[in-house]
Amino acid sequence: MVEQTVVREHIKARVMSLVRSAEPSSYRNPKLYTLNENGNNNGVSSAQIFDPDRSKNPCLTDDSYPSQSYEKYFLDSPTDEFVQHPIGSGASVSSFGSLDSFPYQSRPVLGCSMEFQLPLDSTSTSSTRLLGDYQAVSYSPSMDVVEEFDDEQMRSKIQELERALLGDEDDKMVGIDNLMEIDSEWSYQNESEQHQDSPKESSSADSNSHVSSKEVVSQATPKQILISCARALSEGKLEEALSMVNELRQIVSIQGDPSQRIAAYMVEGLAARMAASGKFIYRALKCKEPPSDERLAAMQVLFEVCPCFKFGFLAANGAILEAIKGEEEVHIIDFDINQGNQYMTLIRSIAELPGKRPRLRLTGIDDPESVQRSIGGLRIIGLRLEQLAEDNGVSFKFKAMPSKTSIVSPSTLGCKPGETLIVNFAFQLHHMPDESVTTVNQRDELLHMVKSLNPKLVTVVEQDVNTNTSPFFPRFIEAYEYYSAVFESLDMTLPRESQERMNVERQCLARDIVNIVACEGEERIERYEAAGKWRARMMMAGFNPKPMSAKVTNNIQNLIKQQYCNKYKLKEEMGELHFCWEEKSLIVASAWR
């Protein structure tokens, strides 16, 4: 107990920012990577398809993130804004620490100049409870963390029933052998333990063992140390995990190769998990958003340089265009239009339709809990879309409906008789808590409510990975494999020292990674599910699959062949389109009726 207290105090002292910019010494390999294997970059931009005339779009600029203004924005954030833990009166720890205390010899660029009142104050009354496969500190004085027995029993029964219906057997904790193929990369911890535990017959043998152990550590890759650290943490070995966190911070860089970049973000997720500060970091990263144009540009860059996300939008738009062909009045309901990128493309596509064009009405749910934009930001996005529609001769009206997604009802959506109704879910459903979080299954309730609207078409675009119900360690493995593919794909499209690339990784990827790794329960917002689970949920809600047409599939396939390297792949399974980096499925798009 004393040892764990010391470790926790050490963790508290080392909590720092999730995101940093590296000094020149952190550069590992400044080699520039092109988009395709031929070594040229003339096929880099997808702007011709996604945004044919970038110069006419007031939301985009060629230099979306001038370094000076970007750093000034974050470093000038007010210091009187705080996110404090509700319990404890211990010393506040700056989320970014002093400039001299940063690992990787780095300096803070991203942050909110906030301080966290960490839940590791030695003066606080705490108890340890088991959450999944790890031990976390819970605070009972003013936090209702213990539920009534009857509620817990009811939740268990509901989960058991829905698990049987949804086929959750794959979510059970399994050995690492069943998660992935074991190779030498994953043997770091075992080799280290063997060296440490081997009998010492003489002082010479002791010396050799010590040298051998050092060699193992020095030769270990960031991936090996990350996995060993996550395993140690899942087993409650805090001191071992902390040691590996410190080791990782010396060898990773947000400007290094993909393995170093993803390790830089995931190690901070592990540190936040040990410090129970994941939810505070998550809040801090959305406490003060950049100016609207910059945020929009960051999302736009992500869709251009990691095109699997854009392919998902294009597939949904293709299905929508086919569904509204010949219709006069079309009403699209979108529960999170993000930054409106999908509808920029859709409006231009409608403008190119032959004959009479439909009149389009778009209702966007402006959820105050959304992590994609500031409250009220949807109105600004709507104005941009209306201007774009006017410029392209498309009849278009936009309505931002401020409401929590969980309480939206048919009566509030303003559906009218005679109009063709389309519902679009793009990277939104995974934010809704399901039966594994609460007895009120908001994820399935939303789908049933949408079914009651009798839409002509429902489109779903989601990440194809399970970070929802799996326990911590297998979830960590899945998240690493998934985001490794994302970071590797970015390595083919933007140079490693690119300011745009670092902004994309910070604003669009890092926050999700930390939330997946560090948080549990209702605090874990990023709850992706695999394609099969989404399929089961849609069918349980009463929807029938509508396979993507050959035209939609062929159009995207041709786009990939013409403008992207052959590592981007499109696979069709059960009428759904899977967009992959090499053999790893990243995004899945499907249509339902």
Swiss-Prot record:
Residues 220-280 are annotated as: Leucine repeat I (LRI). Expressed in seedlings, roots, shoots, leaves, flowers and siliques. Residues 518-593 are annotated as: SAW. Residues 202-211 have a biased composition (Low complexity). Transmembrane segments: none annotated. A motif (VHIID) lies at residues 330-334. It comes from the Eukaryota. Residues 299-364 are annotated as: VHIID. It is found in: Nucleus. Keywords: Nucleus, Transcription, Transcription regulation. Residues 213-593 form the GRAS domain. Residues 29-61, 188-216 are annotated as: Disordered. Residues 380-411 are annotated as: Leucine repeat II (LRII). One of its GO terms (cellular component) is nucleus. The keyword Nucleus applies. Residues 35-48 have a biased composition (Polar residues). Residues 421-515 are annotated as: PFYRE. Its main location: nucleus. GO terms for molecular function: DNA-binding transcription factor activity; transcription cis-regulatory region binding. One of its GO terms (biological process) is regulation of DNA-templated transcription. Belongs to the GRAS family. Probable transcription factor involved in plant development. This is Scarecrow-like protein 1. It comes from Arabidopsis thaliana.
